[in-house]
C-alpha cells in the first residue's frame, strides 16, 4: 500500500472511530436530574447511542428507542425496539405510541434525553388523526 493510500485509510478509520456513539456521546450527557432520566430515541444509530448512555450513566435511567431491524444492541435499562426503515411498519407505529406514552407521564423534575439519528422519521411513524400508516407507507 502506498503512503498516500495508507494515510487516507488511517484518516478514514480515525473519522469513523471518532463518530462512534461510545466515543462522542459521553462528554455531552446531561447533569443528573432531580427526578428520573428517561431516554427516548429513533434512528439507525439510536440503539448504539442508548448503549453508550447506559455504559456511561451512573444513576438510574430507563427508556425506549426504536431502530432499524438488525441494528439493535443489547441494553439492560433502555428498551430497544426494531422496526422497518425506510418504509414504516406497525412495529414503528407501536414504538412511537409507547414513546409518546412514556413522555406523557413525566414530571417537571424529570429529564428526557432524546437520541435521534438518520432514519428516525420512518421509525417514528405516528400519523395524525385522519392519516393512516398505509398513507405514510
Region roles according to the model:
Residues 1-117, 121-137:
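Non-transmembrane, aqueous-exposed alpha-helical and coiled segments at domain scale
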